[in-house]
């Protein structure tokens, strides 16, 4: 659902800008949509509340939570956190700054740039849908390896920029390749840590992912202001290359345990 909304957003905003002289209508449409979603949640709140409670598991989870910080003493956990930090940082940076790079840095028409941003987010959605079709046929580590390598190639095409079309295709490749990475990394957590630390590790990983999305996209913006928007390409290449290095290190550690 996230990917679908992110795909439709640029298309809706482009259509509104072409039909109206004010960008405020776009935010108005978004506000009304979010209000309707909130209203629907309120109306159906009783259906979302489960009546079944599992008391024994609750106490067990609380016991593990008191030892949650012990998880941070494991080097493999810190490597996993950095891996999530880099992944969401690269995803967010490409999603937030590629449009500015294309329109302001490379004089691409706004409508065309918006179309390819929708392709990027749509590719991420398609990638996650395809994950369900291939996950049983491929080893998770092999799938992650291929996807991360594809993100490196995609970001390299954005940096290289022989033509606008190849840059657009690089962005699309990044979107499709990024789709399976987050859910695959989450599902592979039990292989990296022992059973009693899985829940806590996943929580830390999601927190690191949120931090990465905010921090790295902000850093990219600062660099773009001080250097140029063209810094986006090498920035993404560095992030994705570090992702690959970390993933291979984590895999070797897991196989050695």
Task: Tell me what each language-model feature is.
Residues 1-50:
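Helix-loop-helix hairpin linking two adjacent transmembrane segments in secondary transporters
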Residues 127-140, 224-225:
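Helix-to-loop junctions at the C-terminal end of transmembrane segments
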Residues 193-229, 236:
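A late C-terminal transmembrane helix in Major Facilitator Superfamily
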Residues 52-80:
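Juxtamembrane intracellular "pre-TM" segments in multi-pass secondary transporters
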Residues 142-157:
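Structural signature of the two symmetry-related core transmembrane helices
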């Amino acid at each position: 659902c996230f990917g679908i909304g992110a795909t439709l957003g640029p298309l809706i905003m482009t259509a509104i800008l072409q039909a109206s002289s004010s960008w405020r209508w776009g935010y108005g449409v978004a506000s009304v949509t979010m209000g309707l979603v909130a209203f629907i949640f309120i109306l159906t709140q009783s259906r979302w509340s489960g009546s079944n409670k599992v008391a024994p598991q609750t106490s067990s989870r609380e016991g593990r939570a008191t030892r949650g910080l012990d998880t941070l003493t494991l080097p493999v956990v810190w490597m996993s956190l950095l891996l999530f930090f880099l992944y969401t940082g690269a995803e967010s940076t490409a999603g937030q700054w590629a449009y500015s790079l294309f329109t302001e840095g490379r004089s691409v028409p706004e409508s065309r740039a918006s179309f390819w941003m929708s392709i990027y987010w749509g590719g991420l959605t398609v990638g996650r849908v395809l994950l369900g079709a291939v996950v049983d046929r491929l080893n998770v580590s092999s799938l992650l390896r291929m996807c991360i390598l594809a993100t490196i190639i995609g970001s390299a095409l954005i940096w290289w920029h022989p033509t606008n079309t190849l840059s657009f295709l690089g962005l699309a490749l990044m979107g499709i390749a990024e789709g399976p990475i987050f859910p695959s990394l989450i599902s592979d957590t039990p292989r990296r840590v022992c059973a009693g630390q899985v829940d806590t590790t996943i929580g830390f990983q999601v927190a690191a992912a949120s931090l990465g999305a905010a921090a790295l996209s902000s850093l990219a913006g600062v660099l773009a202001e001080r250097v140029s928007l063209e810094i986006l390409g090498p920035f993404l290449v560095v992030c994705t290359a570090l992702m690959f290095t970390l993933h291979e290190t984590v895999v070797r550690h897991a196989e050695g345990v």
